[in-house]
Amino acid sequence: MLFMTVSTSEYSEAKVLESLLSRIAKGDKSALGELYERTRAAVFGFAMSMASTPADAEDVLHDTYLAVYSSAESYAAKGKPMAWIMTIAKNLARMRMRKARRQLDIADDDWGRYLAAKSEVSSDERVLLQTAMKILSDDEQQIVMLHAVAGVKHREIAALLDMPTATV
């Protein structure tokens, strides 16, 4: 028979973290500060493993504790509070990476210059595209820019933006 052992200190620390999460769920901000002090090094190290820069890891760290504070009441005490916190950090880091891949940071003035430089885009098409860009969502703008301006194929856009090809 195989037994898994958990050290007394690990068990005790999990209980302390669960107690802090319970207090946070009741609005205790000092409990959030204590949780942060006890777990920040581990969360930051994990965020650094996923982030491209230390600044991004810091952002994930701070966003993680904001999310912990706002959703502490949803934590189900099962002896794994660090796993719950790390899952929040992982999801936030992934969202940040997706968003960074989707950012193209092209201003409206630059959009006109891009279209003007594309000889295969007529002036009528240019006006139509500029008008469309003003009413499209950010995701839709990125799709149009990648396809109409950069000539990227739909399946490549889908992979780049982590979307189904049918959405593109």
Show where each model-derived region lies.
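Internal acidic/polar
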Residues: 2-5, 10-17, 95, 102-131, ...
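Short, charged helix-capping/linker segments at alpha-helix termini
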Residues: 6-11, 25-34, 44-63, 165
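Short amphipathic alpha-helical boundary/capping segments
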Residues: 19-24, 128-136
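Short helix-capping/turn signature of helix-turn-helix
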Residues: 37-41, 49-52, 145-152, 162
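Structural recognition of an alpha-helix C-terminal capping motif at a helix-to-coil junction
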Residues: 45, 59-66, 70, 79-91
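Helix-turn-helix DNA-binding module
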Residues: 55, 134, 138-142, 150-167
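Arg/Lys-rich amphipathic alpha helix in sigma70-family domain 2
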Residues: 70-77, 86-107
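Short alpha-helical "packing" element that flanks the helix-turn-helix/winged-helix DNA-binding module
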Residues: 129, 143-144
